[in-house]
Regions:
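NTP-dependent small-molecule kinase module
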Residues: 101-102, 142-145, 164-207
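Phosphate-binding/switch loop-helix module in NTP-utilizing enzymes
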Residues: 71-108, 113-114, 200
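Post-Walker A helix-loop "phosphate-sensing" segment adjacent to the P-loop in P-loop NTPases
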Residues: 26-34
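Conserved lysine of the Walker
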Residues: 17
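The conserved Walker
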Residues: 13
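ATP-dependent NMP and nucleoside kinases share a basic, alpha-helical "lid"
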Residues: 94-148
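Hydrophobic positions on the alpha1 helix immediately C-terminal to the Walker A/P-loop
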Residues: 20
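Conserved nucleotide-sensing/catalytic segment adjacent to the nucleotide-binding pocket
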Residues: 33-34, 42, 46-90
């Protein structure tokens, strides 16, 4: 499927990446497949739950990126894949998988996807969502309490010990690889409209 377009959406935690992914889904509907880097956290069956809670999940080594690259290549070749899923309540990969079918537009979303050369080189359009750190941590707190069963103390501890340092070490430097930087994430309507127009043009070029 040489006409496939692969879009990478990166940036710090809680910065609005998913809002932009939804906008692309709304625009292209069934012609979009999405791969979330978060689903490719490594399996830790041999580590007790209390110890899994202490792992650094914001370092590139936390992810099974080679599997994501393999799955991305398969989708680009027109093959269906079984994507892993991750259970945040137990800090481990879940037994269930998600069937992802090939599509004209493939979106890869994650905080560290631009920090991985083998993944980065497969992306036709690279978008980096840039949002103020205070806004990002507030969004993360709301999300983790509401959707992931976390308590406030554990969220703040994780943010200060791993999330913030890893953002400064890996996420922020990877911004230089972006084709387009979107300030204020999904709330920047002007930037979103510009990005969507660019994607439409790219799709048209491949038709």
């Amino acid at each position: 499927m040489s006409d496939v377009i692969t879009i990478g959406i990166a940036g710090g935690t809680g910065n609005g990446k998913t809002t932009i992914t939804r906008r692309i889904l709304d625009e292209f509907g069934g012609d979009v497949s999405v791969l979330y880097h978060d689903n490719y956290y490594k399996r830790h069956d041999d580590i007790p739950f209390p110890e899994r809670k202490k792992l650094n999940y914001d370092h590139p080594n936390a992810f099974d990126t080679p599997l994501l690259v393999q799955h991305l290549d398969a989708l680009r070749a027109g093959q269906t894949i079984e994507c892993p899923t991750y259970d945040y309540t137990v800090h481990n990969r879940a037994a269930e998988t998600i069937t992802v079918t090939p599509a004209k537009v493939i979106v890869v979303e994650g905080i560290l996807i631009f920090a991985e050369p083998e993944l980065r080189e497969r992306l036709d359009i690279k978008l980096f969502v840039d949002t103020d750190a205070d806004v990002r941590i507030l969004r993360r707190i709301v999300r983790d309490v509401r959707d992931r069963g976390r308590d406030l103390e554990s969220i703040v501890t994780q943010y200060l010990t791993t999330v913030k340092p890893m953002h400064e070490m890996f996420v922020e430097p990877s911004k230089r690889y972006a084709d387009i930087i979107i300030p204020e994430g999904g709330h920047n309507q002007v930037a979103l409209d510009f990005v969507m127009e660019r994607i439409r043009a790219y799709v048209k070029e491949r038709d």
